[in-house]
A protein has these predicted regions:
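Cyclophilin-like peptidyl-prolyl cis-trans isomerases
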Residues: 5-6, 12-171
């Protein structure tokens, strides 16, 4: 009986550590109409946002969604199925503000004037985003592909917006 109990506890710890390692090492791969973008998700900074983004990616939510707002020197925004900047998945998130500094390639959750209105829309910063630190939830950092983000069609919305062809999670 003791051996069974020890084995059961050991399996439990193994499962818990596997889940934590998978979440911490998760990379979101965006295949866009301009190329690939690799985003390292930051569950230690925004665990609830990373969990929600993971759900949306696994559901295929982001596949086919356009970059509806691209402002040179500031950011590129996506995640709205209507392409207007007004839509979302229908599930609001409580803000997880941090002191993680917004810089080139930082990925943040878009929201309205209400701090707890983040849903599915997110933005990728170019350079002029430092003032957003502590004001918008950071959940990722682009590791590869900022050259791709820089190629996205500009506008609010762009006349011919680029899109996310597919989004998936990779190790």
């Amino acid at each position: 009986m003791r051996t069974f109990f020890v084995s059961l506890v050991g399996i439990g710890f193994l499962l818990m550590s596997t889940q934590n390692d998978a979440a911490a090492g998760e990379t979101m791969l965006l295949e866009t109409s301009q190329g690939q973008v690799e985003i390292t998700m930051l569950p230690d900074v925004a665990p609830n946002h990373v969990a929600r983004i993971t759900e949306l990616v696994n559901e295929g939510f982001y596949d086919g969604i356009v970059f509806h707002r691209v402002i040179p020197g500031f950011m590129a925004q996506t995640g709205d199925p209507t392409g207007t900047g007004m839509g979302g998945s229908g599930s609001k998130l409580t803000a997880e503000f941090s002191d993680y500094e917004y810089r080139n390639g930082t990925v943040g959750m878009a929201r309205s004037s209400s701090p707890d209105s983040g849903d599915s829309q997110f933005f990728i910063c170019f350079d002029g985003c430092g003032h957003l630190t502590g004001q918008y939830t950071v959940w990722g950092q682009v590791e590869n592909g900022m050259d791709t983000v820089q190629k996205l069609a500009v506008g609010e919305p762009p006349a011919e917006p680029d899109q996310i062809i597919s989004a998936k999670l990779v190790d």
